[in-house]
Design a protein with these regions (language model features):
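Extended amphipathic ligand-handling, pore-lining, and cofactor/metal-binding catalytic surfaces
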Residues: 102-340, 345-359
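Bacterial Sec-dependent N-terminal signal peptides
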Residues: 1-6
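C-terminal motif of bacterial Sec signal peptides marking the signal peptidase cleavage site
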Residues: 14-18
Length: 359
């Protein structure tokens, strides 16, 4: 095809040369043919770049799914191999619904500092820490691993293990970094195979949302495989009927995060920050689940504790009273001129880095 294009362009040039000398026409044709062939080669190279980039994007889309299959390991390996084979120019062209150059190219920290905690032969007592997960290596090592390490230190007679509920994240980490993290089914199957008798499940979820419900459903199918199974409450405890209902868990969290935020900002207490015109906004993920009232309850808790300059917001904008626009209006109406923005999330991953820090 490129040769045919070159010949056609050369013929057109010869015809346009008109009644000039034969030598001139021949030189013109030769020169035009050379230019045309070069253009055709560039076009061919451009097509090859697009094909290679699209192939990589398609392979990323194939592993950007919430269900693990028998082909997942091979698909993760194929996606990474396709990425590694691309030139820098081709990598910038990787684009699809779920794929972009940052999927493999973004530096999120050193994965070797993390620990997937999927060893076998662990004894009869297992403490399974269940998290949504994050593909940000630094955040995963500092936040999720940090929690797991603390639980292991506090419970030396138990073996702490890990499970993520987001298969999309598990696949991302496996494809990019070669780190294999168990999903719920894998973790529970591993516990059974290891002869675990007593299983305690500690979620790192913030509330009784969809992820917590799905976790409980998965565990329910394995209850007869162990002598005892216990599931801990999420961080904010029980949900409660409406926005006015608060509990000790929410009070403890509200006090802890506000105290740390105030200290980090350089104030003696929240009142001193308020006097200086500073407000604190804690941003949660947000959810359409009925547990979304937990965010409103956290706002009620802050007010009950006297933290009038502390506001609760959500990235996803649910419930409506915690949407960014609503929180901004509250801060303005209260007259604060400075705002300290902090995540109300277990992990400072994608939302904290992109939606908050990148806003």
């Amino acid at each position: 095809k490129p040769a045919a294009v070159a010949a056609a362009l050369a013929l057109s040039t010869a015809l346009l040369a008109g009644c000039g000398s034969t030598a001139a026409s021949s030189d013109s044709v030769a020169e035009s043919t050379a230019v045309s062939e070069s253009t055709a080669e560039e076009a061919e190279e451009g097509d090859a770049d697009e094909v290679a980039a699209k192939n990589c994007a398609d392979l990323i889309d194939a592993i950007y799914v919430q269900e693990r299959t028998d082909d997942t390991d091979a698909q993760c390996e194929a996606a990474k191999a396709a990425w590694d084979a691309l030139t820098d120019t081709q990598k910038e062209m990787v684009e699809s619904e779920n794929a972009d150059p940052e999927y493999f190219g973004r530096d999120t920290g050193d994965a070797s500092k993390d620990d997937p905690r999927n060893e076998d032969e662990i004894g009869e007592n297992e403490l399974l820490v269940v998290s949504f997960g994050t593909s940000f290596n630094g955040s995963r090592a500092a936040d999720i691993k940090g929690i797991e390490d603390a639980l292991q230190a506090a419970n030396p007679d138990w073996s702490v293990r890990r499970a993520f509920t987001a298969q999309i994240i598990i696949n991302h980490v496996q494809a990019r970094d070669g780190e294999k993290i168990d999903n719920m089914k894998q973790a529970l199957d591993r516990a059974v195979a290891n002869g675990v008798k007593n299983l305690v499940v500690q979620p790192t979820h913030l509330m009784h949302g969809a992820e917590y419900d799905e976790m409980c459903e998965a565990i329910d199918e394995y209850k007869d495989k162990f002598e005892s199974v216990s599931i801990a409450e999420p961080l904010l405890g029980e949900v409660g009927a409406d926005a006015t209902v608060i509990n000790e868990d929410k009070e403890a969290v509200a006090t802890a995060i506000t105290t740390e935020a105030v200290k980090t900002a350089g104030y003696e207490d929240a009142a001193a920050a308020a006097a200086d015109g500073t407000a604190f906004v804690f941003m949660g993920h947000g959810t359409s689940h009925t547990a979304k009232v937990s965010y409103s309850q956290m706002q009620t808790t802050m007010e009950t504790l006297g933290y009038d300059n502390v506001f609760i917001g959500t990235v996803e904008g649910e419930p409506e009273d915690t949407a960014c626009e609503a929180v901004i209006e509250k801060v303005k109406e209260a007259g604060y001129t400075k705002v300290v923005l902090r995540p109300l999330m277990v992990v400072a991953g994608d939302h904290a880095n992109n939606d908050m820090a990148g806003a």
